[in-house]
C-alpha cells in the first residue's frame, strides 16, 4: 500500500526499490523505467538543482570517465543490438555527453582543443594537480595485448602524454598529484560477466608491458629519468577504496621510482569489487575496503560502503597525509608521506 501511494504521489517519476539489510531503499529518478538520457537536456534537467547547491558550498574540479557516456565506452562499443538506444553512434553519444559535461562543469577552454578535459590546477608552491582524460584518446577496448605502441594501444594518446611529461617536468611544486580516471594495476574487464577484453590499463597477464601498459611504462620511465619527485596518483572508476604502493622490486617492469596510488569511490552508487591486481608494475596492496564474498556485489549506499579521501599537506614539514574515509566520516586508513628533495 505504501509503495502504491508513493507511486501515485510522484506521478511521472520512476520508482525503483529493493530490499537491503531488511530495509526498504527507495530511489527516484526523473526518467521513465526504460528511458535513457541520450540528449544533453535530460541530464542537465535532472542534476542542475543539486549541482548548483553543491557548487555554492565547495570548490569542485571534475574529470570524466565512462559513465558520462555509457559503461566502458570506447570506439569498439557496439549498440546495434541494444534496443535501449535509438542513437547507435558512439561518437555522437560521446559528443552529446561532452557538451553536457562542459555545460555543467565549466572548464577553462584550451584554444588549440576546445572541450579538452586534461589540465593542471596549481595550489601554490606545495601542490600541482594534473587531471587526466583516459577516455577521449584511447584506442578501442580489446584484449590489450599489443606489442607495439600505436594509437590503437594507447589510453592517454600522444598529445596528452606529451603535455603531461612537459607539465610534470616544468612543475616547481613539492607534490605532483596525478588525478587518473582509472587505476594503473587493477584489472577492469570490458565484459565483466565473460571476463574478456580490457577497459583499463592492465591486461591481467602479470608480465612485461603490453597494450596500454606500454604507454604507462614509458611515462613512469620518463618520471624516473627526469628526476621528477613526489608524484602521487589518485583514482577511482572501481567502486571501492584501496591504497596501492608500486614497488619496482616486485614488478615485471622495474624502470621507475616507487609511488603511491589511492583509490576512493563511490560516493553514492553501487559498491563492487575487489578487482584483481596485475603485477606488471609491482603494486602492493596496503589497504582495501570492499564488499565481502558474503555481502555480494552492487551493494546500495545504505550498506555504508561509500568512500572518499582527504589529503592534507603541512606548510611546515611539507608532509602529505592521506586518509581514506567512509561516508560516516570514519577514518579507515591513514599514511603520512615524506617529501623527497626535488632534483
Annotated model-derived regions:
Residues 1-343:
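Metal-dependent phosphoester/phosphodiester hydrolase catalytic core
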Amino acid at each position: 500500500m505504501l509503495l502504491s501511494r508513493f507511486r501515485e504521489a510522484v506521478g511521472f517519476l520512476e520508482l525503483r526499490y529493493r530490499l537491503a539489510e531488511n530495509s526498504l531503499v527507495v530511489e527516484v529518478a526523473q526518467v521513465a523505467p526504460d528511458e535513457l538520457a541520450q540528449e544533453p537536456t535530460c541530464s542537465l534537467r535532472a542534476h542542475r538543482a543539486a549541482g548548483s547547491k553543491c557548487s555554492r558550498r565547495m570548490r569542485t574540479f571534475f574529470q570524466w570517465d565512462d559513465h558520462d557516456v555509457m559503461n566502458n565506452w570506447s570506439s569498439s562499443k557496439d549498440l546495434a543490438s541494444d534496443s535501449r538506444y535509438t542513437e547507435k553512434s558512439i561518437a555522437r553519444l560521446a559528443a552529446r555527453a561532452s557538451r553536457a559535461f562542459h555545460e555543467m562543469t565549466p572548464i577553462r577552454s584550451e584554444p588549440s582543443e576546445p572541450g579538452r578535459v586534461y589540465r593542471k590546477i596549481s595550489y601554490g608552491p606545495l601542490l600541482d594537480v594534473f587531471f587526466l582524460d583516459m577516455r577521449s584518446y584511447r584506442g578501442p577496448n580489446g584484449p590489450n595485448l599489443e606489442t607495439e605502441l600505436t594509437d590503437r594501444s594507447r589510453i592517454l594518446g600522444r598529445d596528452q602524454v606529451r603535455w603531461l611529461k612537459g607539465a610534470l617536468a616544468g612543475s616547481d611544486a613539492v607534490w605532483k598529484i596525478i588525478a587518473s580516471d582509472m587505476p594503473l594495476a587493477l584489472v577492469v574487464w570490458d565484459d565483466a560477466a565473460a571476463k574478456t577484453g580490457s577497459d583499463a590499463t592492465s591486461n591481467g597477464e602479470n608480465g612485461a608491458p603490453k597494450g596500454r601498459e606500454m604507454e604507462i611504462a614509458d611515462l613512469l620511465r620518463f618520471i624516473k629519468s627526469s628526476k621528477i619527485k613526489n608524484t602521487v596518483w589518485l583514482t577511482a572508476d572501481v567502486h571501492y577504496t584501496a591504497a596501492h604502493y608500486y614497488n619496482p622490486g616486485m614488478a615485471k617492469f622495474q624502470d621507475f621510482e616507487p609511488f603511491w596510488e589511492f583509490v576512493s569511490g563511490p560516493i553514492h552508487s553501487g559498491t563492487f569489487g575487489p578487482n584483481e591486481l596485475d603485477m606488471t608494475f609491482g603494486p602492493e596492496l596496503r589497504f582495501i575496503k570492499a564488499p565481502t564474498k558474503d555481502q555480494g556485489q552492487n551493494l546500495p549506499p545504505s550498506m555504508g560502503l561509500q568512500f572518499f579521501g582527504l589529503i592534507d599537506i603541512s606548510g611546515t614539514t611539507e608532509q602529505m597525509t592521506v586518509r581514506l574515509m567512509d561516508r560516516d566520516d570514519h577514518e579507515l586508513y591513514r599514511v603520512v608521506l615524506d617529501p623527497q628533495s626535488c632534483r
